[in-house]
């Protein structure tokens, strides 16, 4: 049994199906979940430190494989978009650092050249050079989740209801929930982990994020992801883009704010000579962990309770690899990555009954 069908639950289902395992999903289908609102970007490079993103060499092949398989399974040919990520370079000092990175091969195979001058397009002056990141892209995440939800419903594998933790019974042979029974349950409820009486001790540090849907004046090409303290990438509508995202830790609600909208527009308009019309504003809470790593594994007391959560801001990139790892852990006694294993928090945060 899987609780939650966000990006984490989606990938769990996919890996369980590949392994030939049966399952059922329980989800309340919240319209404001972080997964449905997220941009779905994956980027193998951490621009601020000019390093590969954590485990990028493992995560990128895994996500490409998984999402291409979902394309075929759901008969949707536009879920995963491998788009180059355009990164302008604004100062001479920054250019020196990027050239050093290139010469050292620190970001191979994700960058292989630096172009002098501003990139093509409606960019304002002030760029000394630019580079393009390969093997990045984005997933049409809302489209993927909704299509997979429909697939599960048609096959009788989806129960739409709010989960009542008090109705979960742990038995010698597995778990029982109302009229459902299973060998185990995997909790993938995203930010709603705070309501979970079994895993509420895990140190999550949720963040609020806001994203905009904007219409442009037609001067932006829809063949890349624009990145310069913001992310701007195309939707399936002509001249309509997604612009994100903000980070807020104090006010944790799902209400878009004028301040966040203005912040995003200001960042984009500082770089681009383009008129942006806001069509929609959305906000959600991301299930991030204090150390910015996913948290997966088995409950220290109940061997039939598992956690797959904490995908945070990089869920699209992280979830495929670790979903496969968790499935292997459960069924084939595979190992869990130490940096992602739930056990890393036992000593300081878990109190035994």
Per-segment meaning from a language model:
Residues 1-3, 180-192, 323:
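Short hydrophobic core segments
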Residues 280-353:
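C-terminal catalytic lobe of FAD-dependent flavoproteins
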Residues 24:
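Conserved beta-strand positions in the Rossmann-like core of class I SAM-dependent methyltransferases
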Residues 50-62, 92-93, 131-147, 255-260, ...:
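Short beta-strand to alpha-helix junction loop
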Residues 131-184, 188:
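Helical element adjacent to the flavin cofactor pocket in flavoenzyme catalytic cores
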Residues 7-8:
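Hydrophobic/small residue at the entry helix of a nucleotide-binding pocket
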Residues 11-19, 28, 36, 41, ...:
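Active-site substrate-recognition segment that forms the wall
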Residues 41-121:
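Dinucleotide-binding Rossmann-like beta1-alpha1 core, especially the glycine-rich loop
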């Amino acid at each position: 049994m899987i609780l939650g069908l966000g990006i984490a639950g989606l990938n769990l289902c996919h890996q369980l199906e590949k392994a030939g395992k049966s399952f059922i999903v329980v989800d309340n289908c919240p319209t404001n979940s972080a997964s449905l609102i997220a941009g779905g970007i994956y980027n193998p490079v951490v621009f601020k430190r000019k390093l590969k993103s954590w485990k990028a060499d493992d995560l990128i092949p895994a996500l490409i494989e998984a999402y291409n398989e979902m394309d075929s399974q759901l008969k949707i040919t536009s879920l995963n978009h491998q788009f180059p990520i355009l990164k302008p370079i604004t100062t001479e000092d920054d250019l020196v650092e990027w050239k050093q990175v290139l010469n050292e091969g620190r970001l191979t195979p994700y960058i292989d050249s630096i172009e002098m001058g501003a990139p093509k397009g409606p960019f304002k002056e002030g760029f000394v050079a630019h580079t393009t990141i390969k093997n990045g892209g984005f997933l049409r995440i809302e489209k993927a989740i909704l299509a997979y939800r429909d697939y599960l419903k048609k096959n009788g594998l989806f129960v739409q209801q709010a989960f009542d933790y008090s109705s979960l019974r742990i038995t010698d042979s597995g778990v029982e929930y109302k009229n459902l029974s299973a060998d185990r349950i995997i909790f993938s409820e995203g930010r709603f982990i705070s309501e979970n009486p079994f895993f509420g001790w895990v140190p999550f540090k949720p963040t609020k994020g806001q994203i905009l849907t904007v219409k442009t004046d037609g001067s932006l090409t829809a063949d890349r992801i624009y990145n310069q303290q913001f992310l701007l990438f195309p939707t399936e509508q002509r001249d309509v883009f997604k612009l994100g995202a903000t980070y807020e830790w104090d006010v944790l609600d799902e209400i878009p704010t004028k301040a966040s909208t203005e912040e995003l527009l200001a960042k984009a308009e500082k770089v681009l000579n383009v008129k942006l019309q806001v069509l929609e504003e959305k906000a959600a809470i991301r299930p991030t962990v204090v150390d910015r790593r996913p948290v997966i594994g088995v409950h220290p007391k109940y061997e039939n309770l598992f956690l797959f959560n904490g995908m945070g801001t990089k869920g699209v990139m992280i979830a495929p690899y670790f979903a496969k790892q968790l499935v292997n852990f459960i069924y084939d006694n595979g190992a869990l990555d130490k940096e992602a294993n739930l056990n890393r928090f036992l000593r300081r945060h878990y109190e035994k009954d």
